[in-house]
Amino acid sequence: MARSATLAAAALALCLLLAPPGLAWYKPAAGHSSYSVGRAAGLLSGLRRSPYARRSQPYRGAEPPGGAGASPELQLHPRLRSLAVCVQDVAPNLQRCERLPDGRGTYQCKANVFLSLRAADCLAA
């Protein structure tokens, strides 16, 4: 009985060690000059948006801007879609806040977010 429990524990440990790690949903930018902005911090680590993300206004077409049917000006080069973005500064504009009519006391505020696509800007602190 003890031998089978030890064998099962060893097999489980071996499976856990050999399994590839799961992908992190949030990868912080390198350096200390990046700022966390709460729940949106993980979304700022790349230019692509999730198709399931909540948007304030729905798209008029079946595909989002930059998709296969978009005009050439809106299409991004594949390299640009996978770039990491370094958040340099976040300047909230509290005078441009308005209450949303959702009945939960939610406010939508505007902010200036300064981004950089250069790795050197992210490393300099």
UniProtKB/Swiss-Prot annotation:
<comment type="function">
    <text>May be involved in the regulation of feeding, neuroendocrine system, memory, learning and in the afferent pain pathway.</text>
</comment>
<dbReference type="GO" id="GO:0007186">
    <property type="term" value="P:G protein-coupled receptor signaling pathway"/>
</dbReference>
<dbReference type="Pfam" id="PF15180">
    <property type="entry name" value="NPBW"/>
</dbReference>
<dbReference type="InterPro" id="IPR013298">
    <property type="entry name" value="Neuropept_B_pre"/>
</dbReference>
<keyword id="KW-0964">Secreted</keyword>
<feature type="signal peptide">
    <location>
        <begin position="1"/>
        <end position="24"/>
    </location>
</feature>
<keyword id="KW-0732">Signal</keyword>
<keyword id="KW-0165">Cleavage on pair of basic residues</keyword>
<dbReference type="GO" id="GO:0005576">
    <property type="term" value="C:extracellular region"/>
</dbReference>
<keyword id="KW-0527">Neuropeptide</keyword>
<comment type="similarity">
    <text>Belongs to the neuropeptide B/W family.</text>
</comment>
<dbReference type="GO" id="GO:0001664">
    <property type="term" value="F:G protein-coupled receptor binding"/>
</dbReference>
<protein>
    <recommendedName>
        <fullName>Neuropeptide B</fullName>
    </recommendedName>
</protein>
<dbReference type="GO" id="GO:0007218">
    <property type="term" value="P:neuropeptide signaling pathway"/>
</dbReference>
<feature type="region of interest" description="Disordered">
    <location>
        <begin position="54"/>
        <end position="73"/>
    </location>
</feature>
<dbReference type="InterPro" id="IPR013297">
    <property type="entry name" value="Neuropept_BW_pre"/>
</dbReference>
<feature type="propeptide">
    <location>
        <begin position="56"/>
        <end position="125"/>
    </location>
</feature>
<dbReference type="GO" id="GO:0007631">
    <property type="term" value="P:feeding behavior"/>
</dbReference>
